[in-house]
Amino acid sequence: MARRDQLNGKGPLVGNLRSHSMIATKRKFNVNLQKITIANSNGTPTTLRVSAKTIKTLKRKGILSAQA
């Protein structure tokens, strides 16, 4: 399964790991994925893998309850 946010599609970023001598080697910054359960429009629960930032945004907008 790909490490990708199922709501907004945010995926891993690629950057450099810098040693003390400033030699650059490639590294990957993974997304902080969490599992949440949201009820559909018909009431059935659905499990999604979303990033922690998406959960924070959903709580701030009032879409997700504060307990999740």
UniProtKB/Swiss-Prot annotation:
SUPFAM superfamilies: L28p-like. PANTHER family: 50S RIBOSOMAL PROTEIN L28, LARGE RIBOSOMAL SUBUNIT PROTEIN BL28A. GO terms for biological process: translation. Pfam families: Ribosomal_L28. Belongs to the bacterial ribosomal protein bL28 family. This is Large ribosomal subunit protein bL28. GO terms for cellular component: ribonucleoprotein complex; ribosome. InterPro entries: Bacterial_rp_bL28, Ribosomal_bL28, Ribosomal_bL28/bL31-like_sf, Ribosomal_bL28_bact-type, Ribosomal_bL28_sf. Keywords: Ribonucleoprotein, Ribosomal protein. HAMAP family: Ribosomal_bL28 (MF_00373). One of its GO terms (molecular function) is structural constituent of ribosome. It comes from Mycoplasmopsis agalactiae (strain NCTC 10123 / CIP 59.7 / PG2).
